[in-house]
Design a protein with these regions (language model features):
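Preference for long, amphipathic alpha-helical scaffolds in soluble/luminal domains
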Residues: 1-180
Length: 180
């Protein structure tokens, strides 16, 4: 997996994050211009668990990229940062509504899970902003949406796992609302 880490190609994400070094993984082969935060978080977690000493440099670089890709609202999009120009979904050829890459709860949960595994706590700014984002985006019924798993069960379990990993109180009212 280390051999597939993108360390020298600055993709479209670099437009919004020009000072950020590459350090991510793509969903598919030969797609160096479009790495994503979701798969990068999972790969970094796997490398960290496999042999944290041998993989430390690679994982650290991945974590740096993940933190750098956090959106202003505290969440994470998949391929880009702050790509939330919703008006674009209303132009005639945007009938599939996928011209954007807004932050989503499931992807944000994966990024927070990586940070938790690496020892980050809720007092770290990226984690604090991420948890605040998840609290704001919780649905009235207690669930969270999962864009990439495309349902509320997927989104909710993803978020609950991340909140557990980061040490949120399972008795907190918002967590209890999710499991009720």
């Amino acid at each position: 997996l280390r051999d597939h880490q993108i360390l020298d190609v600055k993709g479209d994400w670099h437009d919004k994050r020009p000072g950020l070094r590459p350090g991510a993984w793509a969903f598919q082969y030969r797609n160096e211009h479009y790495p994503d935060t979701d798969d990068s978080s999972v790969v970094a977690m796997a490398l960290d668990r496999a042999d944290s000493d041998e993989n430390r440099e690679s994982v650290d670089r991945g974590v740096e990229w993940i933190i750098g890709m956090q959106c202003r609202d505290g969440g994470w999009g998949s391929f880009d940062a702050d790509n939330t120009h919703y008006y674009l979904n209303h132009i005639p050829f945007a009938d599939h509504g996928a011209l954007l890459d807004p932050p989503t709860e499931d992807v944000s949960a994966r990024c927070i899970s990586l940070l938790a595994q690496r020892g980050y706590k809720t007092d770290h700014p990226a984690v604090a902003k991420g948890v605040a984002y998840l609290k704001r985006t919780q649905m009235a019924d207690g669930s969270w949406y999962g864009r990439w798993g495309t349902n509320y069960i997927y989104g909710t379990w993803s978020v609950l796992c991340a909140l557990n990993a980061i040490g949120e109180d399972p008795q907190a009212p918002y967590i209890q609302r999710a499991v009720a």
